[in-house]
Regions:
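N-terminal helix-loop segment corresponding to the beta1-alpha1 unit
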Residues: 1-189, 332, 353-373
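Short, well-structured beta-strand/strand-turn elements
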Residues: 37, 302-316, 373
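Aromatic-enriched alpha-helical interface/lid elements that frame and gate functional surfaces
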Residues: 232-304, 308, 368-371
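An anion-binding loop in the catalytic cleft
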Residues: 238-242, 294-295, 339-373
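A short glycine-threonine-serine/GTX helix/turn-capping micro-motif
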Residues: 157-168, 190-192, 223-227, 231-233, ...
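Active-site-adjacent capping/gating segments
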Residues: 47-56, 314-360
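Glycine-rich beta-alpha junction loops
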Residues: 44, 123-124, 197-202, 240-242, ...
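Oxidoreductase and adenylate-handling cofactor-binding alpha/beta cores
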Residues: 143, 169-190, 203, 207-214, ...
């Protein structure tokens, strides 16, 4: 299999050491933007190893794949031969593991001073927790990103692994790689990128810290403007057990929301920005949304600028007319997946190629090197 390349990163060569979600997502972004990404898998039969580092699906698309035993001298030698011709190496081992195996930053950059050596971890390369195990929920907990999530009086809820693994992890890794590549154009040398999920998750709370600094986020969880405390920024159940999302924060949009709900002329409705009336507003909105199905409310608000939208599942989002018109989702290898983003007018990205099969599509290092002259 040969991955198709097109986009602003065409010609950039990336070596990715197979790992879990954050680094593969960051490398997917790089591949989507045109980079030639070669994933280095560990040898072994399918089973536990594949569960530990999935080899299919959207996160693995757009790559070529080779297999190396990085615990053997020959495997390390093969990796270093790739490093000599690569622009970027991405690894997600715990701190010190790559050094112990013989392909840490110093060794690799001695071979290739222009190499961007990107490291993806949960806690970062230093600090008291650097060597500690963890997952998304742990990183966002320590970063202060988990505590604000949840209803008033209830425990924080686990928001999938979108914030730590992907938003604060893989996406920030990709940003770091791009920044280092840009800086290399000025300095002529690469550098180490230390991308930590706890750092990225903390960065995602920048807006919240701004609210805290101005006193606009002072109430307990679930009583603030953006955490479901405000009835005009929340979700509501419909008669068919669907949901509608409401984000009518500004008075102009709020007025249209009330019109769509048939509440515009209700003299007893509390004022929008009076928190003492929010419970009553929520009760009224809840009752009204429960009168119709999700599709009926979607039709009612289709032509109203009220900041109201249906809550779609990942299996149906591609069917929404707006997403269909923009091509927000694409079919890759018979599977519906999010399309590459963002979009570029002069250097558009190519249709992603399916994830390579490690057994069928793996190619020797020497074959890759012939294409990296």
């Amino acid at each position: 299999m040969t991955a198709a390349h097109g986009g602003p990163l065409a010609g950039v060569r990336v070596v990715e050491l197979a790992s879990l979600a954050p680094a593969p997502f960051g490398c997917m972004v790089l591949a989507d933007l045109g980079a030639d990404v070669v994933r280095v898998d560990r040898p072994g039969a399918p089973g536990a190893g594949r569960l530990a580092a999935p080899t299919g699906g959207p996160l693995q698309r757009g790559r070529r794949v080779t297999t190396l035993d990085l615990k053997s001298p020959d495997g390390v030698a093969g990796l270093l031969s790739l490093v000599e011709r690569a622009d970027v190496l991405v690894e997600a081992y715990r701190p010190g593991v790559a050094e112990r195996l013989g392909f840490g930053p110093q060794v690799c950059q001695e071979r290739n001073p222009r190499l961007v050596y990107a490291r993806m971890t949960g806690w970062g390369q230093d600090g008291p927790l650097a060597a500690r195990a963890g997952h998304d929920i742990d990183y966002i907990a320590v970063a202060g990103a988990l505590e604000p999530l949840g209803r008033a009086g209830e425990r924080p809820y686990a928001p999938m692994n979108l914030l730590g693994d992907f938003g604060g992890g893989g996406m920030l890794l990709a940003v770091g790689v791009l920044a280092a590549l840009l800086e290399r154009e000025r300095s002529g040398v690469g550098q180490v990128v230390d991308a930590a999920m706890v750092d990225g998750s903390a960065l995602l709370t920048s807006f919240l810290h701004g609210l805290l600094g101005t006193g606009l986020w002072a109430a307990p969880r679930g009583r603030n403007m953006f955490d479901g405390g405000a009835p005009f920024y929340d979700t509501y159940r419909t008669s068919d057990d669907g949901f509608m999302a409401v984000g009518a924060m500004e008075p102009a949009f709020y007025a249209v929301l009330l019109a769509g709900l048939g509440l515009a002329d209700d003299p007893d409705l509390p004022a929008q920005y009076d928190p003492s009336g929010w419970d009553e507003l929520r009760r009224r909105f809840t009752e009204r949304f429960a009168e119709r199905t999700r599709d009926e409310w979607t039709a009612i608000f289709a032509d109203l600028d009220a900041c109201v939208a249906p809550v779609l599942g990942p299996g149906e989002a591609h069917q929404h007319p707006h997403n269909a018109a923009r091509g927000t989702f694409v079919e890759v290898g018979g599977e519906i997946q999010p399309a590459p983003a963002p979009r570029f007018d002069r250097t558009p990205t190519a249709q992603p190629s399916p994830a390579p099969d490690p057994e069928r599509d793996a190619v020797p290092v020497d074959t890759i090197l012939t294409t990296w002259q």
